Amino acid sequence: MWLTSPQQAVGFSPLFYNSYFDGNDQKQACTLRLFNVTTPYSLLLAAQSKLSSKDFSTLLKIIVVISFRYNVICELSCLDQEKIYNKIALKITNGEITNIQELLPLLKKLYIKDKIFRDTFENKTFNTNDRKVNRLVKYILTTIEKDLSGIDLALDSPDYNIEHIYPQNPGSDEDWPEFIDDYINISTYKLGNLTLLSEKDNREIGNEAFSQKVKVYAKCKFEVTKYIAEHYFVEWSPAIICSRQHFLVSEAVKIWKVSQLATK
């Protein structure tokens, strides 16, 4: 079945996730669902029908990276993106594109360059009170964790959750002397202030002072969290949050990257 419009592709999305793909392809497709990105549906369904399974799997991984940079972090126009995807889908359907190498040059316009991606991500905040955003943050941190330690965490596992290092509801101002009102809303929801922690540890440390929290971080099995105890054990402040955000973004630039599309 060929989809002739993005609207049809959106309507076809349950089959897109549940029946078309399996294994790693299904995992990548579900990541697009997590991103709430629908613009590449028509392209992916055309590619699944016409390209080799190997080329399709490669394309799907590339689309996930493009979507993370373009849609999730930079939040750029979906209309422009949709037009490009639809043009490529038509070329695949008409037989003008028959393999991934012919397709790649057409995706370059949608691949956000490292500097723009980095600069935007450095200033990004994530309101983790929103359930979908919270899940997105878990995806980002678990992906970075896998790259750092090799631990592949199940995204929906109840055994761990998101820890706000500077708490959402800090108890005493004396426990967090580096934070003033101007910083609170910004600092709390920056990725640099968020980390992974077991559900048990997170519950037990609650809104404790950083001097108490860091002792728990030091024993944590997650590298992304142990890093805090190893590098920022003296204090926690807005400046340090920015420093850690810089570290996490640097990792992200390497992880969500397509070398064939990167231009020097």
Model feature map: region roles:
Residues M1-K138:
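A cross-family structural signal marking well-folded subdomains
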Residues A9-P14, A29, A46-A47, S67, ...:
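A sequence-composition feature that detects small, non-aromatic residues
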Residues L45, L60, V64, E163-Y166, ...:
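Generic hydrophobic alpha-helical scaffold/packing signal
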Residues S52, P158-N161, K264:
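N-terminal low-hydrophobic presequence detector
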Residues K54-I63, F68-V72, L76-K83, K109-K115, ...:
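C-terminal, well-folded lobe of enzymatic/effector domains
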Residues I92-I228, E235-S237, I255:
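Betabetaalpha-Me/HNH-type nuclease active-site subdomain
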